[in-house]
């Protein structure tokens, strides 16, 4: 099996050279901005203990979700509302879920391609694997994207689910977050038969390229993929910060002549109006 190495975004020129259109690049940025704003609104309304699972993870959430098809499924962790937003769930529905009890949601989630979060990682993974097994059995070419913490996936019961996914060649992507650049979880996934790729978790372009390749393989029935999104270190300097994914993308778009203050202002104003309409608790 081919060993997967760390990936960073390659330099990109205009549409053809980067293989990612300018329209898609702006869409990635806009989706990250919406995820950040949703998380901030939820924190403001429901308190700091309640978030949308997006703060610091916008690049991975957006890159792994933005190109999914309607019948693909995502498996967010408990409280994981930003992946649902990118998947296409309406804001009104998201705030309805926010007010509800988690165990009252499975049917509503399933109708929108959302696998209801479980009480623990084992419950979450069991439901995700069941959905992936169904997709493979019916040859539907649908896939499942699991969002989780790297440590949870690469120890104890998580390793058993990785082994099953690899053995059955299930159409599933495990998108996980490492809290430190010193952590290295992808080799553990490779030990269990999955291609493991490490990518800069604050670089949405890099994550998008990795995810796009993984999605292609999953739809072809080749193999599942373990994608480790982690803080990147350049020499002794860590590139981590509360807004680094958004800041990085703004800098990237600026280099391509695609970013302006007006773009950000317009996107922010538009989504603020949408939030104001539905977020009264």
What residue ranges belong to the model's regions?
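Conserved acidic/glycine
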Residues: 1-61, 66-70, 234-281
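Glycine-rich ThDP/TPP pyrophosphate-binding loop and its adjacent helix/strand module
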Residues: 116-280
């Amino acid at each position: 099996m081919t060993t997967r190495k760390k990936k960073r975004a390659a330099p990109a020129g205009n549409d053809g050279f980067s293989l990612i259109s300018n329209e898609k690049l702006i869409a990635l940025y806009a989706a990250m901005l919406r995820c950040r704003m949703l998380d901030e609104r939820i924190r403001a309304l429901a308190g700091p203990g309640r978030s949308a699972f997006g703060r610091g993870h916008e690049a991975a959430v957006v890159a792994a979700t933005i190109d999914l098809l309607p019948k693909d499924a995502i498996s967010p962790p408990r409280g994981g509302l930003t992946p649902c937003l990118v998947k296409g769930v309406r804001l009104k529905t998201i705030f309805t879920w926010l007010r509800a009890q988690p165990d009252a949601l499975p049917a509503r989630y399933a109708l929108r391609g959302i696998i209801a979060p479980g009480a623990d990682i084992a419950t979450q993974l069991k439901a995700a694997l069941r959905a992936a097994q169904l997709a493979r059995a019916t040859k539907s070419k649908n896939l499942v994207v699991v969002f989780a913490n790297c440590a949870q996936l690469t120890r104890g019961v998580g390793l058993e689910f990785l082994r099953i996914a690899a053995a059955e060649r299930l159409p599933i992507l495990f998108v996980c977050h490492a809290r430190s650049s010193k952590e290295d979880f992808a080799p553990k996934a490779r030990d269990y038969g999955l291609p493991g790729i490490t990518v800069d978790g604050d670089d949405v372009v890099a994550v998008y390229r990795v995810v796009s390749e993984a999605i292609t393989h999953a739809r072809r029935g080749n193999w599942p993929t373990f994608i480790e999104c982690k803080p990147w270190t350049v020499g002794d300097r860590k590139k981590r910060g509360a807004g680094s994914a958004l800041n990085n993308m703004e800098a990237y778009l600026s280099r391509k002549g695609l970013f302006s203050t007006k773009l950000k202002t317009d996107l922010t104003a538009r989504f603020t109006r949408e939030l104001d309409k539905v977020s009264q608790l």
